[in-house]
Amino acid sequence: MSSSRSPHRSSTDSASKGALHGASHGDSPSPSKNRRRLWAGVTGLSIACVVALGWWAGTPLDNPGTATPDQQVGDGEAEDAGQSTLWQQYQRVWQANQTRPPEARKPLPLPDVSRAGYHQGEALPALELEPRDAGEASDKGSAAKGTAGESEKGALRRFDVTAYGADGSDTLSDRRAILKAHAAMRDWQRQGSDDADRPARRGVLYFPAGDYVVYGAAERDWFYSRLVALKAAVADAERQQALREALLKMQGLSLAGSHWTLMGAGSDVTHLKQTRPMLPLHASWYWSTPWLLHLGNLAEGGKQEEWQAVTPTSHRQPADTQDAITLADEADEADETDGAALAPGDEVLLESIDKRPEAVARALAPYQMEKDASTGESRWLIERDGVIKRARYRVVARDGKRLTLSLPVVHERFPGEQWRIARLHPAREVGVQGITLNGNWRGHFKHHRSAEDDSGFGLLDLDGITDGWVRDVRLDSFNQGVKVRHSSQLTLEDVTMTGKPGHIAMTISDSNQVLARQVVDQSHAWHAPGVARYATHNVYLELEHAGDSGIELHGQQSRDNVFDRKRGGHVRDRWGASVGHQPNHLRGLVLWNPVNTGKPHAAWHFMRADSHFGKVIMPTVVGATGHALGIANRHDYVRVMNAKGVTEYDPLPPMDALQARVESPGEAVKPASLYRAQRELLQETRE
């Protein structure tokens, strides 16, 4: 721990200064008293130094094979008062890397999330729409022609759902009117798509103040009656299940397309409602209920083209340091003649799957794979599936086989890894703002009791989107609030969750560079906002959730995600993930200046020895304040696992080796926000 932030610093400094001060004034004490005071001051300083050295000696470092002096907390250089040691190390390495050739760049001690958010963190667009005339909504006859309920300013046009039959003042279904308005908007966009010299037309699906029923009793009864008829008409169980899934997927509203916004008059006055729970795709798949609103590219994350091989690296390439890759010689030779070669402007997915034992061991270090004591079989699927690294980028330049990407490759690359790249077709410029989505969850939530408990009221699914946003949105009375998946470069801000406790508040899954700021979960959801499944380089900035809940860390190889200035609790069994999908999070989880508003913990376990669940690989906890958040040691976990026959650690780690990299416990550090500081550093460098 830095001595400038030590809780013992002020007392030891005052003791030594007091002794010296007393000796320099008239009315001075006797020489023997001076010696005793000086000795007390020196002794106090010595104790403080020993405590500080002991703490840092017990602080786990990165893998022995990959650590550098720049990664070690407290390397002896002078610090600014209150400045995080890790932040100072990050600054030094990051700045030095700007002048080094790519092959000589050093690993950063923290993930670089400076480019998270809409257009890499830029301000969200301001939609300037002309006010709707009072008579427009009643002009239903011309609505079918695509004029009423629309206001146009340049390439921006508003499609008012009330002009297509929606009525926010009654309790009848508005589903058909919403679909008609969306179809009219899409037709208008397509009419302007042939002009390559004009920007894409931007549509706004507009909901004036009112309550609009998207899924209610009429929809529930209709789908249920069709499901009963399906069961009676189709005897084959496999075919029956396939038809059931196709039917029930239509329960929610799937609204495709790019360059459009679903917009209300404000979250305090515009409400889209789901008054009945939807039916799950399979009775025993509790997670499978469709979402009320499904926006994006509806081809499950966006249409993906064929994979192309990437030339392997000959040396270790640290994460966040190099923005170029080279296609293999055979990668797209066939595409050169048919115009399908990757080109600037293309959205791409870059992926590696490495099943080599050394890759799995490296991903889990300093821990070992947990195995069944009786069979010796691995508990975690990472050994079977391999280490999976995947993220989304945009190609910004091409020179022969060399592609320059929109941001540095977010994963570390090692010799022997096989990388590949594919063009994607995500939805772009999709926004949701100024609305409340109301579910009708009124039960007493029990985890994994039923499909209704887990997913009966799922409100907003953002799937396969690049450069999108959500702002001024409230989610009320839900089982699942928001899910961002297969996406990149999104900003979610001013999002509030309310109502009775449900299952999951917000999930960022299989996505990168997503920024969620000023998200407030007042619903006491079982899983507070968090990450899952390959998520990387995402940021929760100033997240607030209840003290009786905990963030979601739903496993499947998430890595390098940042919770910046989070306020909320730490509760056992709230991370999520099955046994096979452990660990809950690989390396790179950062809690920066978190405030514990829940129960105090003398020794919080990031690696639980008393359960198959609850495994996080060496997170970083900096500036934790609020109620106590002590960190358990690795020694006790390893000792118990060995005793159970689950692992074979030899030797055991020392008693003071913690389950996290810890800095400044009990005192917040500077910078107050890691994300904002990284953005400032990035901007300074660009200038």
Regions found by a protein language model. Name each.
Residues T162, H259, D268, R428-G439, ...:
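Right-handed parallel beta-helix
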Residues R449-S455:
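Extracytoplasmic beta-rich repeat domains
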